[in-house]
């Protein structure tokens, strides 16, 4: 068993998965992992399948030099996005591994949320490409290590979610301003 960068707060309610020296681009995998962080497990699996099928994109926020724009990135509040198929496949495989670990531990798979996911650089692998006039250039690959753990979310009553509205939301402000206007017109 390898060492993780962090440990979950409640180990009994969480499951882990990790992969080392994976032959998949570090930068693409980092952006894909950032997109699925804090997602429920079922939504993350559906999202990664949509990325593979080009139905949803992965927003590129940090490693975005030379990345083209796409309309699907608007739902993430950015303009640049791609569909890193291989990264999505590797993360999907790791999520399945974590799901089977959770099932083995007796956790409720439907309530799992990706609490922690981290992508680190692995040692670069060196190859060579032959250039004109007898020169040789490096042909490097950037593999990565991935670690994640999922925890069971606390179930909250659905009535409490739907019934309460935040104080400063747009709807609440509009309603209060309408009340003030009607009270002002009634006074005159």
From Swiss-Prot:
Q: Which InterPro entries match?
A: Ribosomal_uL22 (IPR001063), Ribosomal_uL22_CS (IPR018260), Ribosomal_uL22_euk/arc (IPR005721), Ribosomal_uL22_sf (IPR036394)
Superkingdom as given in the UniProt entry: Eukaryota
GO cellular component terms listed in the entry, alphabetical order: cytosolic large ribosomal subunit
Annotated region Disordered: the residues are 155-188
Keywords assigned by UniProt, alphabetized: Ribonucleoprotein, Ribosomal protein
Which GO BP terms apply?
cytoplasmic translation
Q: Extract the SUPFAM superfamilies matched here.
A: Ribosomal protein L22
Q: Which GO terms describe its molecular function?
A: structural constituent of ribosome
Protein's name according to its UniProt entry? Large ribosomal subunit protein uL22
Supply the gene name: RpL17
């Amino acid at each position: 068993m390898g060492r993780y960068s962090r440990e979950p707060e409640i180990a009994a309610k969480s499951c882990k998965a990790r992969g080392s020296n994976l032959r998949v681009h570090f930068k693409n995998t980092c952006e894909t992992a950032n997109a699925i962080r804090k997602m429920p497990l079922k939504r993350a699996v559906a999202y990664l399948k949509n990325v593979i099928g080009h139905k949803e994109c992965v927003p590129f926020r940090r490693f975005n030099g030379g990345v083209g724009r796409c309309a699907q990135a608007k739902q993430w509040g950015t303009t640049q996005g791609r569909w890193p198929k291989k990264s999505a496949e590797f993360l999907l495989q790791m999520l399945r591994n974590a799901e089977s670990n959770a099932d083995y531990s007796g956790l409720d798979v439907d309530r799992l949320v990706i609490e922690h996911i981290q992508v680190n650089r692995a040692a670069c692998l060196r190859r060579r490409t032959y250039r004109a006039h007898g020169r040789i250039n490096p042909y490097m690959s950037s593999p990565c290590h991935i670690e994640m753990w999922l925890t069971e979310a606390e179930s909250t009553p659905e009535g409490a979610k739907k019934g309460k509205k935040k104080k400063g939301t747009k709807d609440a402000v509009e309603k209060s301003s309408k009340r003030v206007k009607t009270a002002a017109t009634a006074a005159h």
